[in-house]
Amino acid sequence: MALKIRLARAGSKKRPYYHVVVADVRAPRDGRFIETVGSWNPVLPKDAERVKLDAERIQHWIAQGAQPTDRVLRFLDQAGIAKRPSRNNPTKGEPGKKAQERLALAKQAEEEAAAKAAEAAAAAAAPAEEAASE
């Protein structure tokens, strides 16, 4: 039986409240669970009352093979119960391939326009110099 430590939604409409539960992965999100090991109230400001966790029981279930979900793992990392691996995605902020192609084309067109403008300026200055030297 595969176990997850995950969030089960409670609370009313537009007023979310979550229980941190240990449940079988096949069980419905808000349905059957094995044990409640904490709670999270996202409506509260960021303080100690916002996330409540039973560290001893969570460590017990992790030792039994329960896997925390991403959001729960964030809470466990903040509480110092479990370590969340850091993510490294250095290309996240870069534009996509097509956007990079468009930027390269725009830069090339800009360079060509600048070269033509410089060439035209040089051509315009050249006849004036010839007239002055005669």
UniProtKB/Swiss-Prot annotation:
InterPro entries: Ribosomal_bS16 (IPR000307), Ribosomal_bS16_dom_sf (IPR023803). Keywords: Ribonucleoprotein, Ribosomal protein. GO terms for cellular component: cytoplasm; small ribosomal subunit. Residues 115-134 have a biased composition (Low complexity). GO terms for molecular function: structural constituent of ribosome. Residues 79-134 are annotated as: Disordered. GO terms for biological process: translation. HAMAP family: Ribosomal_bS16. Belongs to the bacterial ribosomal protein bS16 family. PANTHER family: 30S RIBOSOMAL PROTEIN S16, SMALL RIBOSOMAL SUBUNIT PROTEIN BS16M. This is Small ribosomal subunit protein bS16.
